[in-house]
Amino acid sequence: MHHSTVLSVLSLLAPAAQASLWVDRAPSYVRPYAIEHYANANALTIGSQTYRFPVTGPSSGNRFTMLMTNAPQSGDLGVLPHIHEQHHENFFCYKGRFQLWAHKGNDTEARLLTAGDYGSVPVDTTHTFQILDPDTEMVGVVAPGSFEDLFYFLATQNVSYETQTPYTPANLSDDAGSGSSADIITQLVSFDVHAALNFTPPRDLVNGSRPAGAIWHDDINEIPSSSGSPYFVASNWGPKYLNNVTGAYQVVQPFVTPTTGEGNFTQGTITLGRRFLNASRQTWNLTDHLALNILEGAVDLTIANETATLLAGDVAFVPGGIPFSYDSRAAFSKFLYVSAGVKGLDQQLLADAAEWSWPVFPTTSP
């Protein structure tokens, strides 16, 4: 290992040894950390929506931003239709329901997303969404990072809820803050938001999807073999792979591949069982950054002799070059992963995995 690489790793380990993994907001520099679900992580409101930012540009070395949006149902769009020319935006439904539209070229796709569903909005794609259930949470991943600056600019107010409630329980304006005046739109261009006000979202969804006959919660959702087009993956209806060589069963379900992420990031879910009897603990040391968002169960994440028990909704960030291990404390755990680059945790697991037809692992150890 080069001397400069050793110094780089030590510089990351030093603050980790001095401070707890648990923080209440994303750090201003790259270090390992964990944030509790609904912590006031730079929380702000835009209309009726409350946004939190467990991973930011500064905390990820500008590789990606992760944001949580909590809001009640609304009869209006959550944001004006718009395009990003430099940012790939990803939508995941943690709970509740929302509708997502994506238009590119001559095609307009739409899906009704429920818990576990995913939608990919690559660059140059017109998109918008509408929140439909009283307790909805969207997990957004935007690459590259620092996209949170847009929301800081648009914020109605910064908030710090004493009770850590998901959002303000009050009848508030549904104005998403993206504005319709030429002045506001011009300012938003600097944040890579280009208004597409001529786009009218179609409402002719059948069984939660558009166009007619689109595969959704009724058959295998394939991931495109090329990049650039929007696509959707229904919960547990995408490709699945089983890894049984790391001391525990792990089922990997990719949403974003090295191809569709254009080499910048990958994303998906990993379902994890308890460690096999007498199996040794696997230690990982990735070349690039990793974020985990727990969806179900409980996961013990160990870094530099500190173990954080992550529960549903919690987020952890592990920088590249930092050794770590993780185990499922529960019989069945599942987390959303975001890996910077193309050599992330998912790719390491997939290298020793086999195609699998089920979202759960086998009944007996290998």
Over which residues does each language-model region extend?
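Short acidic-glycine-tyrosine-enriched beta hairpin
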Residues: 36-37, 59-63, 90, 104-124, ...
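Ordered, small/hydrophobic-rich secondary-structure cores
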Residues: 70-169
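Short histidine-centered beta-strand/loop micro-motifs
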Residues: 55-57, 77-85, 102, 130-131, ...
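A short, N-terminal "cap"/entry segment at the start of jelly-roll beta-barrel domains
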Residues: 19-70, 172-268, 273-274, 361-366
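Fungal secretory targeting signals
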Residues: 1-20
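Glycine- and acidic-residue-biased ligand/ion/polar-headgroup-sensing regions
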Residues: 85-104, 281-305
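Double-stranded beta-helix
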Residues: 132-214, 325, 329-366
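Long compositionally biased, domain-poor regions of proteins
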Residues: 130, 147, 273-275, 288-302, ...
